[in-house]
Design a protein with these regions (language model features):
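Surface-exposed extracellular loop regions of Gram-negative outer-membrane beta-barrel proteins
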Residues: 238-293, 441-531, 589-591, 596, ...
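Positively charged n-region of N-terminal signal peptides that target proteins for export
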Residues: 1-5
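Structural preference for beta-rich elements and adjacent junctions enriched in aromatics
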Residues: 20-449, 456-457, 466, 885
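Bacterial N-terminal signal peptides
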Residues: 6-15
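Alpha-helix capping and helix-loop boundary segments enriched in small/acidic/polar residues
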Residues: 269-270, 313, 383, 430-437, ...
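Outer-envelope beta-barrel architecture signal
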Residues: 89-91, 133, 176, 192-196, ...
Length: 900
């Protein structure tokens, strides 16, 4: 480890505790509040939102709520009471929200789990009573449900978690009431445990107030661990937990005809492609603490498509997981991160988007498929866009003191078809080629608490059937990762954590060479003293690790210091997401928050951060520092700003396997703000920019406006535009012995002017809490123009000489292509890098939950795509051309039915 790296960490470790001393001693923590639950008895409880059954009077009330915001620690401005009953099969919660101005209660309609500007009442149950995991059930005054799962003591949450439960509300002149029925089968608990953790909360939208029964203040450490206790749950057994949700769907795809005029008929083209499907989801309680969730032939047609993007860098784009099976209950599979505030681009050890990914083999047509046709031969192909998931299963819950999670999925082999024709249109050959092999994906996660220490372990495994002779050279046969992590609470505010993980990938020599040369590693770099491609290897192994010290609570000061490494051979990309290996980095963050409202502000805060990183050869890759600040005004507007700077360092990725280059010093900034979120019309804006010492620069703005013209309708418009100039934009690279100064590898760059425009539009129309229509449209245009072609002529250059400065020529043809003749006698080459990419994405989703757990989806999706080898046309013209670009429509009807 370089001396400067060690020095920074040593200074950070000594400085952070001193800076983090609170301005006053923390208050002494009293014992938890307690609430006695009452037995519901044999008389039926009518779920009507009135709490008029006599049994409700036998339950003790929880009252005396305390504000979390806007005045932390102050008594709630309006009285609230909560009571709990229990029966053999359910928990009942009654909440009464008194309001002296009941006519001002905010009660808009929206979809379940939507972020509404609304009053809200909720109960949170820590049924494990582990002070780390809890289930939230909430409702607004007109019956819009909200449920979510908290884990890691509330530091993380799963908003996609949807349970099967009921709630009814009522309103009167004195306020409103909510009556919940939560089946025991939807919770996880240990039979015989008569005490759970519990929290009750209420939001009053017009005043921006949130109050809770067991006080949770902004300066507190944790969330679930601060709950009160629900006692008296006598005789809770293990209810039957079996849920079966079959589905049937029908999808019709109308695709454009892109054949050349007069060409042979495409045997795979159909104006409308019909595809019926059926499958089933299953949830089975193996015990009161352990659940099996499975899906067979899953369908995710109702999930919104990924936004269009243009990737001009070598890094893979990270795509958000949206598929319900892989999002719900993912808390158990959270691992691979130490507790810190510093963002250090660590490998993500589990990335479920790998399951069911796009097929990886592109060139599946044999090279001689159209030999008989000569130059006039035409080849038509048809390949799937996604890999079919045959089935997947999760087991999650607890076995004694151990929290356990197991995930397994199997994907089908996928084949592409091809047909070749001669110049007369007569078929020459017809065949198919494997584009994705049969694969299995497995994840195991376990953790347990030992006093103030949490110890965990995890493993991932990918196995592929590579018996097809075309595949062993394309991808590994087997890939695994093993991880061990530990977290120790030194005090209520201080947490030390760390992890170590190892990876092992095996496959053919060609596959392992591909991994060595891939962008995260680039073993082929000619001036890397510690790396080199080994073409005889059939495996690749490596390690990654991280340690961190975090101050996670306190009246004002928070912070963390952390250090991490990833060895050159570590690879988690078969079931994870990793943008680079060969990395050592560290950083420190010091945070100050003021959460007590005074005068013109409700809260304000800021942080300072610094970090640096090297590779294993000791090259300083980055060194940066910055400041961030935010303020919440008394009128409920918000503002934030940041300013960052980085020093001149070394870039070992810019040339994509070529020589090292210097990375210029630069600065970046952003300024943002938002208006009062309680209003019918609310907005936000975000301006960002950057510049560096060699002349690269960028500026962008994103704005948003959301209007609620009626209580059940919300319209949002979110345009964004950016423009920039890049002095060193990668174009291409190839071997050329004449490029002696760069070890026979010629890497071509250019100056590039780039700009992008997008505008997302959303309409949410809610007819009832269970019937809604969502509309979405997003046009997208990205342009790039290239000039002043240049090449590095030696390692560690900051400014690359242009082709003309190096004695060569660059001649542009009428079609926009540029032919470059190097001045060192190398072979000429031609490039056509200018581009305009257009896309229009739209969808409409009608969702009707016609009974709890059962839904009907009617979906329409539209996609238009266009490309031009010209980056000069204005945005307005390109938006007009979108109307003429090839169009694909997808229509889907999906019906699910819940048995349980």
């Amino acid at each position: 480890m370089p001396f400067r790296f060690a020095l920074l960490l040593a200074l950070a470790l000594t400085a952070l505790p001193a800076a983090a001393q609170p301005s006053m001693p923390p208050p002494v923590q009293a014992g938890p509040l307690r609430l006695q639950a009452a037995a519901a008895g044999s008389a039926p409880i009518s779920l009507d939102g009135r709490l008029d059954e006599a049994v409700w009077a036998t339950a003790a009330p929880a009252s005396g709520f305390v504000q979390n915001r806007p005045t932390p620690g102050a008594p709630a401005s309006q009285p609230t009471e909560a009571r709990v009953l229990y029966s053999d099969d359910a928990i009942y919660v009654g909440m009464r929200m008194a309001d002296s101005n009941a006519g001002a209660i905010a009660a808009p309609l929206g979809r379940r789990d939507s972020d509404l500007p609304s009053d809200l009442a909720y109960v949170v149950l820590d049924s494990y009573h582990d002070r780390r995991t809890a289930f939230l059930f909430g409702v607004n005054p007109v019956g819009v449900k909200l449920d979510k799962l908290f884990y890691d003591d509330g530091n993380s949450q799963d908003d996609s978690w949807d349970a099967i439960w009921d709630v009814v509300t009522s309103r009167d002149a004195g306020g409103w009431t909510a009556e919940f029925r939560i089946p025991l089968g939807q919770l996880r608990y240990t039979p015989g445990n008569e005490t759970w953790g519990v929290e009750f909360g209420r939001v009053i939208q017009r005043t921006g107030e949130e109050a809770m029964w067991a006080p949770v203040l902004p300066n507190d450490t944790g969330f679930v661990g601060l709950f009160g206790e629900l006692t008296g749950l006598v005789g809770l057994g293990s209810p039957r937990r079996l849920e079966v949700v079959p589905y049937v769907s029908a999808q019709a795809v109308r695709a454009p005809d892109t054949r050349a005029p007069g060409g042979p008929a495409d045997p795979y083209y159909a104006s409308t492609d019909l595809a019926p499907r059926a499958g089933v989801d299953l949830k089975l309680g193996l015990s009161s603490n352990l659940t099996l969730t499975a899906t067979v032939n899953p369908d995710f047609g109702q999930v919104e498509a990924d936004p269009a993007q243009v990737n001009l860098g070598g890094f893979e784009l990270f795509l958000q997981e949206r598929r319900p099976f892989f999002v719900e209950g993912i808390d158990v599979f959270s691992f691979g991160r130490a507790r810190r505030y510093f963002s250090n681009n660590r490998p993500q050890l589990l990335y479920t988007r790998r399951i069911g990914r796009s097929p990886q083999r592109q060139g599946f047509v044999p090279s001689d498929a159209s030999d008989e046709a000569g130059e006039q031969g035409v080849v038509y192909t048809d390949a799937p866009q996604q890999t079919t998931i045959l089935g997947a299963a999760k087991v999650s819950g607890r076995i004694g003191p151990v929290t356990l999670g197991v995930l397994s999925a199997v994907t089908a082999p996928e084949y592409g078809r091809y047909s070749a024709y001669d110049g007369t249109g007569a078929p020459v050959t017809d065949g198919r080629g494997l584009v994705e092999p049969t694969s299995s994906y497995s994840v195991l996660r376990a953790r347990t608490t030992l006093g103030r220490t949490i110890v965990g372990a995890a493993g991932t495994l990918v196995l592929r059937d590579l018996s097809d002779p075309a595949f062993p050279g394309l991808m590994p046969r087997q890939a695994s990762v093993l991880e061990v992590d530990v977290e120790h609470r030194l005090s209520p505010e201080w947490i030390a954590s760390g992890l170590i993980a190892g990876s092992a990938v095996t496959g053919s020599r060609e596959a392992i060479v591909g991994l060595q040369r891939a962008f995260p590693r680039l073993y082929q770099r000619p001036d890397a003293g510690h790396l080199g491609v080994d073409s005889t290897r059939t495996s690749l192994t490596g390690l990654t690790g991280e340690i961190a010290l975090q101050k996670a609570g306190g009246e004002h000061w928070l912070g963390s210091v952390s250090a991490a490494f990833t060895s050159p051979g570590f690879d988690a990309n078969d079931l994870g997401f990793q943008s680079r290996a060969d990395d050592i980095n560290g950083g420190v963050v010091v945070i100050y928050n003021q959460n007590t409202p005074r005068g013109w502000y409700r809260s304000w805060g800021g942080n300072a951060y610094a970090g640096l990183g090297t590779n294993f050869d000791g090259d300083l890759r980055n060194a940066f520092t910055g400041l961030e600040g935010n303020v919440g005004f008394a009128n409920f507007w918000n503002a934030n700003a940041s300013l960052g700077a980085n020093a001149r360092t070394v870039d070992d990725r810019l040339t994509r396997g070529g020589v090292l280059a210097l990375s210029p010093a630069g600065m970046e900034f952003n300024i943002g703000g938002s208006t009062d979120g309680r209003r019918r019309l609310r907005g936000n804006s975000y301006v960002y920019g950057s510049a560096n010492e060699i002349g690269s620069r960028s500026i962008g703005i994103e704005v948003g406006a959301t209007l609620r013209p009626a209580p059940n309708v919300e319209v949002g418009l979110y345009p964004g535009v950016s423009t920039g100039h890049v002095e060193r934009q990668f174009v291409t690279a190839f071997n050329d012995p004449a490029a002696a100064g760069t070890f026979g590898r010629r890497t071509v760059f250019a100056e590039s002017d780039q700009s992008e425009f997008s505008m997302s539009t959303r309409v949410n129309w809610t007819f009832t809490p269970t019937l809604s229509l969502q509309l979405f449209a997003r046009p997208f245009v990205s342009r790039g123009r290239y000039a002043a072609f240049k090449e590095p002529t030696a390692p560690r250059q900051l400014v690359f000489p242009t082709v003309e400065e190096a004695g060569g020529t660059a001649v542009q043809a009428a079609d926009g292509s540029v032919t470059v003749t190097p001045g060192d006698g190398g072979r000429p080459y031609t490039v056509s890098p200018d581009f305009t990419v257009r896309a229009l994405q739209g969808n409409a989703v009608l969702r009707w939950e016609y009974r709890p757990g059962s839904a009907l989806f009617v979906v329409w999706q539209q996609q238009r795509d266009g490309f031009e080898g010209d980056g000069r046309s204005p945005f307005g013209l390109n938006l007009g051309r979108l109307a003429r670009d090839p169009l694909q429509n997808v229509f889907l009807v999906k019906l699910t039915y819940w048995f349980g």
